[in-house]
């Protein structure tokens, strides 16, 4: 389930410690708070995930000037359906990815917002409370 929140209310209730220093306006004012909500993330390897699979674009390329895209660049991309994640693996633009990570997010893990042209794409602003031990690699 995803519950609409104002980021100020979320911060007051959960007192998040973000995984990085957030730029102004990030996370945005209107967010969704997950509660036992499934998401999927593409992984570099087909049989395991690593901490590199959870690096944001901004972490992976810190010298790049992100401009207005910085709020999205510090977040992580998620997909809201396994079927759509599997389809994405077949697209040329995602050829560097070989696997799919299934994860279930809760309020202390951070907030999400639907972003981009595809309704299945979400950006996740992660907190330090997120535990990578609760992830599952899907068979491809």
Give each language-model segment a name:
Residues 1-69:
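ADP-ribose/NAD+-binding catalytic cleft of ART/PARP-like enzymes
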Residues 7, 54, 79, 100-101, ...:
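Weak global preference for isoleucine
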Residues 9, 16, 122-140:
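Charged phosphate-binding loop/patch that engages nucleotide di/tri-phosphates or the phosphate backbone
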Residues 44-55, 107-114, 131-132:
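Short, surface-exposed beta-strand/loop "edge" segments at domain boundaries and coil↔beta transitions
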Residues 62-130:
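ADP-ribosyltransferase catalytic core
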């Amino acid at each position: 389930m995803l519950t609409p929140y104002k980021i100020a209310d979320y911060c007051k209730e959960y007192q998040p410690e973000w995984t990085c220093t957030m730029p102004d306006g990030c996370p945005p004012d209107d967010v969704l708070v997950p509660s036992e909500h499934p998401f999927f993330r593409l992984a570099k390897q087909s049989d395991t995930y690593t901490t590199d699979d959870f690096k944001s674009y901004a972490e992976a390329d810190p010298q790049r000037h992100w401009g207005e895209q910085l709020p999205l660049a510090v977040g992580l991309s998620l997909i809201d359906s396994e079927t759509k994640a599997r389809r994405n693996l077949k697209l040329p633009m995602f050829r560097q990815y070989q696997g799919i990570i299934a994860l279930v997010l809760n309020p202390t893990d951070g907030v999400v917002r639907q972003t981009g042209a595809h309704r299945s794409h979400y950006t996740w602003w992660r907190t330090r409370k997120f535990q990578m031990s609760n992830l599952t690699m899907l068979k491809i």
